[in-house]
Amino acid sequence: MRVRGGTAAVAVVMCVIAGGCGRAADQTEQTPGVSESPSGTTPSSSAVNPAPTEPAPPTASPAFGYTPELTAEKGAQGTVTYDVHLPQLSGGVDAVRDRFNDGIRTALGDLVENLPGPSKDLTVSIDDGDLGPGPETTRVAVIGPHVVAGIQVYLWYAGGAAHPNQSVSTTVINSDTAQPITYDDLFPNQYAAMERLRQVLPGLDPTGRVRQDNVNVRLEQWLPTPTGVRFYVPVSHAAGDFVPITVPWDRIRDLVDPKIVPVFSQ
């Protein structure tokens, strides 16, 4: 497994804004840094969130010396205001806790920095989001013997846009090494992983929102689960912005770095 040091490494594991990780967004009324939706669906005034493929995992229970927390964070930077919650850890191993907490704060900081666009003059507000139903919200999602992970779901609105949009970022830390685990660490063969996910994800989505042509970017928004890997697949705003789908281990195990699988064992 490749590891990366420092705050910049933590940022790599996150999909901070739509444009940074291929997130689907609408073409005409978004910030300049946000890409066009990968689907041809016309956005509506509110996203449709049909029943997920399976219930969203709950907030992790305290374990292995760590306690999950949600910390309120409110402020302003330039033209961006935010009033959100951050998943944080207390207790446990100092290096692991600090790497996780710093990574979460970096994700919010990057979102605040990038949403105003290149000119830095677009007014943006950021609040807590929910991919729902479930709910699927910001939380510490995993506290395991070898890994801790969290997700941030925020609803942001750029002044003049027709509707707000969801953003998703995830932070996954190897608690044996206090190093982030990235999409690159998960799948050494990027091309093979993309092709496999393109084949299996639509069949695991009973809502029909994910098609093969949706799966055309690195799915860097993901969380480990005991049964597999939960990916947050970007779709059009009208389809819900992101579709959470858990891919069972037996569908992707042969493509996952063999050193990673034991780390995710719960």
Across the structure, where does each feature detected by a protein language model lie?
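Hydrophobic core
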Residues: 14-18
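Compositionally biased intrinsically disordered regions enriched in Thr/Gly
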Residues: 2-9, 19-171, 175-266
